[in-house]
A protein has these predicted regions:
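Short S/T/G/P-rich N-terminal loop/turn motif that feeds into the first structured element of a domain
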Residues: 1-124
Length: 124
């Protein structure tokens, strides 16, 4: 059995999406030690306005305790097809391309999980 516990600090407090759908993508990043996370977060928050032209972020967090050098964020989509379209459009965006050319160098690994809200969730 594998168990991971993290204490997260909100960089962008979570906002329940009003009309963007309830298919959520949770992305977790582990940065390289010795400043990689700060460099990645600085680059990511700088490009976020350009990325949000394609879809709005639900929240952005940095790990305070647990696994060091980690950040995570959540995006909402109306469907998996919409997610694929948004990601394809973002990949064509020059600002996002520039971020990827720099930002990926600060990371060791990334995990993506697609989530659906439980019936009792306020994130419906």
């Amino acid at each position: 059995m594998r168990q991971e516990v993290r204490l997260l600090n909100a960089i962008r407090p979570p906002v329940a999406p009003a009309s963007t759908g309830n298919i959520y993508e949770f992305r977790n990043y582990r940065a390289k030690p010795a400043g990689g996370l700060r460099q990645w977060l600085d680059a990511f928050t700088a490009v976020l306005p350009a990325r949000e032209k394609h879809s709005k972020i639900v929240g952005l967090w940095q790990t305070e305790a647990g696994q060091p050098n980690e950040a995570c964020h959540i995006w909402a989509y109306p469907s998996l097809d919409a997610r694929a379209e948004v990601r394809g459009n973002a990949m064509k965006d020059p600002a996002w391309q520039e971020f990827l050319s720099k930002g990926l160098g600060f990371l060791e690994e990334m995990h993506s999980t697609i989530m659906l809200p439980a019936p009792h969730s306020p994130m419906q």
